[in-house]
Amino acid sequence: KGIVQEFVASHLDDATAAQLTPAALLTHLNTRLLSYGSDRHVTLICMIVDTEHAVLQWSVAGHLPSPILYTQGRAQFLTGQGQPAGLFEHAVFNDEQMPLPEVFSLSLFSDGVFDVMPEQHLITSEAALPKLITTAKGDYAAAVECLGLANCSNMPDDIAMLVLSRNLA
C-alpha cells in the first residue's frame, strides 16, 4: 500500500500525472518488491475509474478471478492478464481501457470466493461467477445472498468482495 501511495504522490506534481497508468503503477510496484529481495509477491488489479470522462483503465498482476462488469442484464469478465508483482524482473503489465456504461456494476473478488462456491473445480467456479452476478443483477447484497454468505456463521477468513456501481436500479 505504501509503495503505491509513494509512487502516486511523487508524480502528482509532475506534468506526467495525467499520464499515470495502472501498468506504470504495477511496474513500479514490481521493481520495488524485487529490490527488497524477500521472495514476496502480490497478485492484484490496479484500476483507475475516471468519472469525469466515464472511462475505466486497469492492469492485472496475476489476480484471479478477473473483475466482472454487469451492464444491460449481462455480466462478463474484463480482459487482461499478467504475472504477479514481485516475482519476475522483466514482468510486463498491460493497460486495458473501456468506456464505462451509464448503468453498470463492477464486481471484484479475492480468490477466497472459490471456497464458498458449490462447483468442485477452480475452472468451473470461475466460469460460474458471471452467471452469479447476472442472477444478482450486479447488486452487492444479492451477490452476498447468492454466495450463501448473508447469514454465514462460519465465514471464510480469506474472502473479499467489492462492488462499484453507477445508476444501478
Q: What positions do the PLM features span?
A:
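Active-site-proximal, acidic helix/loop segment immediately C-terminal to a metal-coordinating Asp/Glu
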Residues: 1-19, 76, 89, 100-155, ...
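A short beta-strand motif that forms part of the nucleic acid-binding face
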Residues: 62, 82, 112
